[in-house]
């Protein structure tokens, strides 16, 4: 589960970077 957190943060960061 802990290995999934950085992936979620990376996805949110990518979405935030898109906007």
Swiss-Prot record:
Highest taxon, organism lineage: Eukaryota
Signal peptide: none
Tissue specificity as recorded in UniProt: Expressed by the skin glands.
Coiled coil feature spans: none
GO (cellular component) term, any one: extracellular region
Modified residues (Phenylalanine amide): 19
Keywords associated with the record: Amidation, Amphibian defense peptide, Antimicrobial, Secreted
GO biological process, one term: defense response
Protein function: Has antimicrobial activity.
Protein name: Phylloseptin-J1
Provenance organism: Phasmahyla jandaia
């Amino acid at each position: 589960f802990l290995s999934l957190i950085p992936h979620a943060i990376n996805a949110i960061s990518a979405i935030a970077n898109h906007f």
